């Protein structure tokens, strides 16, 4: 961040907010993989349901 601030100059502080928004979008992109993990979590309870049916 220091090197980026040096390249961007004093306005880097204002740009820092923009950089902060970009990781937010990246975070949203990371949510779909978590859904896959949740699906795996549901697989556990489904197994329990199968055992209950038996």
Curated annotation (Swiss-Prot):
Its main location: secreted. It comes from the Eukaryota. Residues 1-54 are annotated as: Disordered. Keywords: Amidation, Cleavage on pair of basic residues, Hormone, Neuropeptide, Secreted. GO terms for cellular component: extracellular region. Residues 13-38 have a biased composition (Basic and acidic residues). The keyword Transcription regulation does not apply. Pfam families: Galanin. InterPro entries: Galanin, Galanin_pre. It is found in: Secreted. Disulfide bonds: none annotated. GO terms for biological process: positive regulation of transcription by RNA polymerase II. The modification Threonine amide is found at residue 26. One of its GO terms (molecular function) is galanin receptor activity. Belongs to the galanin family. Endocrine hormone of the central and peripheral nervous systems that binds and activates the G protein-coupled receptors GALR1, GALR2, and GALR3. This small neuropeptide may regulate diverse physiologic functions including contraction of smooth muscle of the gastrointestinal and genitourinary tract, growth hormone and insulin release and adrenal secretion. This is Galanin peptides. It comes from Canis lupus familiaris. The gene is GAL.
């Amino acid at each position: 961040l220091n090197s980026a601030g040096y390249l961007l100059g004093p306005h880097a502080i204002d740009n820092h907010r923009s950089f902060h928004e970009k990781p937010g979008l990246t975070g949203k992109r990371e949510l779909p993989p978590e859904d896959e993990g949740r699906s795996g979590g549901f697989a556990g309870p489904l197994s329990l349901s199968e055992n209950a049916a038996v």
